[in-house]
């Protein structure tokens, strides 16, 4: 649910990544090919894609209705608003082990979520796919995962288009624009997405 250097996991109840039309210029085609070759070797494993994203409480609607030919004007605040982050994993069309947290993610904090929230949510052998963020210490994560029969596979660098959870983050941000004013707590607004969409 919500964590500020503490863990409180929320469990929710395929399919695989669909490539977008844009890529980073830094992307290395050879590394992408290597990643896809490795992924194919885990054809009998459940695919688990994980990622983190951030949300600012300051969200506003960029569009509004008006009479034809009239411009809609609105004032927006220049103040800084609360920022929260979300880490979760996606299995097929479901998100699992979502956790909202404050402050920066660290290796130790991520590993605690990975061990205490994600791994217990996996009910069959899985290949866990994630990017190469600094706090993703692959050696530590592999050791924890392999003890339970799972594998860890890093995405090719600069290749978010191969992680389908990226599209979910965009969906959540659109959802928040419509419901944020209904909630006193920012974290409650974020977690309400799982209540209405994923259960």
Where in this protein do the model-derived segments appear?
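Short functional hotspots at interaction and active-site rims
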Residues: 1-199
């Amino acid at each position: 649910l919500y964590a500020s250097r503490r863990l409180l996991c929320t469990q929710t109840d395929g399919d695989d990544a669909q490539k977008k039309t844009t890529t980073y210029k830094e992307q290395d085609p050879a590394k992408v090919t290597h990643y896809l070759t490795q992924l194919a070797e885990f054809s009998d494993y459940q695919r688990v894609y994980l990622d983190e994203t951030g949300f600012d409480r300051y969200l506003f609607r960029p569009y509004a209705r008006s009479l034809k030919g009239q411009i809609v004007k609105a004032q927006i605040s220049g103040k800084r608003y609360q920022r929260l982050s979300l880490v979760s994993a996606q299995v097929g069309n479901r998100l699992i082990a979502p956790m909202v947290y404050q402050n920066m993610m660290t290796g130790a904090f991520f590993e605690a979520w990975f061990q205490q929230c994600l791994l217990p949510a996996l009910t069959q052998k899985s290949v866990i796919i994630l990017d190469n963020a600094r706090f993703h210490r692959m050696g530590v994560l592999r050791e924890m995962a392999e003890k339970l029969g799972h594998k860890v596979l890093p995405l090719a660098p600069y290749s978010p288009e191969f992680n389908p959870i990226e599209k979910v983050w965009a969906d959540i941000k659109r959802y928040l624009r419509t419901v944020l004013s209904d909630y006193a707590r920012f974290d409650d607004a974020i977690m309400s997405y799982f209540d209405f969409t994923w259960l």
